[in-house]
Design a protein with these regions (language model features):
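Conserved N-terminal entry element of GNAT/NAT acetyltransferase domains
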Residues: 1-8, 139-140
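Conserved beta-hairpin
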Residues: 48-61
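A short, internal acetyl-CoA/4′-phosphopantetheine-binding micro-motif in the GNAT/acyltransferase core
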Residues: 70-80, 103-104
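Conserved acetyl-CoA pyrophosphate-binding loop and the N-cap/start of the following alpha-helix
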Residues: 79, 83-91
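Conserved active-site alpha-helix within GNAT-family acetyltransferase domains
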Residues: 86-87, 107-123, 127-132
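Conserved GNAT acetyl-CoA-binding A-motif
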Residues: 94-106
């Protein structure tokens, strides 16, 4: 079930982000991960249009949108590969004709997921906050 984010979901979002990020971003330092988590908790969730996906009445993943930009799409590792990420992207596309996102170049699993969904890789650039190369990806329906 996909539903709107509620402020009471904040602990679940942070848990999902930590668990999924630990697998997807092992190349990030613990200090950067802590800074990013604080930014998500204290700023990002208040700015983003966020949608939750539940499994067995518990949050299993989320997508956070800033206009047409996917600011974050994370699914608990135990629920990955079951269509939750695809369902969240489908939901985002119901109200948008295009989406854009950035994915770390070293995150090959996510890059493959987005490519399989239909995103096209664009420019590669440096994410200055994380000091990591990232790929800009676009999708138009």
């Amino acid at each position: 079930m996909i539903r709107p984010y509620s402020p009471s979901d904040k602990p679940a979002v942070l848990h999902i982000w930590r668990e999924a990020s630990a697998i997807a971003h092992p190349f990030l330092s613990a200090a950067l991960v802590a800074q990013a988590e604080a930014m998500i908790r204290d700023q990002f969730l208040d700015l983003a249009e966020t949608w939750m996906i539940d499994a067995d009445d518990m949050p299993a993943g989320f997508i956070a949108l800033l206009g047409n930009e996917v600011g974050g799409l994370f699914v608990l590792p135990s629920h990955q590969g079951k269509g939750y990420g695809r369902a969240l992207l489908d939901h985002a596309l119901h109200t948008r004709v295009e989406l854009e996102l950035c994915v770390f170049a070293a995150n090959h699993q996510a890059h493959g997921f987005y490519k399989a969904y239909g995103f096209q890789a664009g420019e590669e650039r440096l994410n200055s906050f994380f000091d990591q190369p990232e790929i800009v990806m676009h999708l138009s329906r």
